[in-house]
Regions:
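A generic hydrophobic-helix recognition signal that picks specific residues
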Residues: 33, 68, 103-104, 149
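Helical (often loop-to-helix) elements that flank the catalytic cores of nucleotide-handling enzymes
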Residues: 119-138, 163-175
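Short, conserved secondary-structure transition motifs
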Residues: 34, 45-46, 114-115, 141-165
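Catalytic-core region of right-hand nucleic acid polymerases
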Residues: 1-84, 133, 176-187
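Catalytic palm active-site di-aspartate
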Residues: 1, 38-42, 75, 98-119, ...
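Active-site palm subdomain of RNA-directed nucleic acid polymerases
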Residues: 80-134, 143
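C-terminal reverse transcriptase regions that engage the nucleic-acid substrate
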Residues: 68, 148-187
Length: 187
């Protein structure tokens, strides 16, 4: 039992992004601004190759043929835990590229959201460095879904940074099919 380690990966919430933005906004000086970068990792679970001895546990039989995975599958028992460790490591290494006074990074599974502070030029440079760092780590990036600016959508929320406030709303498509009957929520 001494070799066993119990852990729990704590995923970020919308408030963590808001808190990061507010902290950065407090530090803005003349010419500084705060922006958000949301850029998903593509096919993230398939980043982790299986040890050859483990491949025999990742086999499916379909239509008379056997299929063996060479990479961790998203729906596998330990896939989320293994991927969570890789995602958390990537987040820590990425955050270490800049001081907390310039970058506040949250990663929800395979969806990073970075709050950035600096001049527009500095923010562009920080974005380039983050993107190149992630690519150097082997991450595929969903550029077609990428967003940079004062308004982004991330994991079901819309964030808007204004001069006076940080506005968060639940995306409309998330709320479809949910209504309030006065006593509670119904689906």
């Amino acid at each position: 039992d001494a070799a066993r380690r119990y852990e729990r990966i704590v995923s970020p919430r919308a408030w963590d992004v808001v808190s990061g933005i507010m902290d950065l906004k407090k530090r803005t000086g003349k010419g500084d601004t705060a922006e958000l970068l949301a850029l998903d990792f593509a096919d993230a679970f398939y980043m982790l190759p299986l040890v050859p001895d483990e491949m025999r546990y990742y086999v499916a039989h379909y239509d008379g043929a056997f299929y063996m995975w060479e990479r961790i599958a998203q729906g596998s028992l330990n896939g989320p835990g293994a991927f969570g460790r890789l995602s958390a490591l990537t987040a820590r290494m990425s955050q270490a590229l800049y001081p907390p006074s310039s970058l506040s990074l949250q990663v929800y599974t395979d969806d990073p959201c970075a709050a950035l502070r600096g001049t527009p030029r500095q923010i562009k440079m920080m974005t380039v460095v983050l993107v190149l760092f992630w690519r150097a780590q082997g991450w595929g990036l969903s550029f077609h879904k990428g967003q940079l600016g004062r308004m982004v959508s991330w994991i079901g929320y819309s964030f808007t940074i204004s001069a006076e406030a940080v506005i968060v709303s639940i995306k409309e498509d998330v709320m479809k099919g949910v209504r309030c009957d006065g006593a509670g929520l119904e689906g």
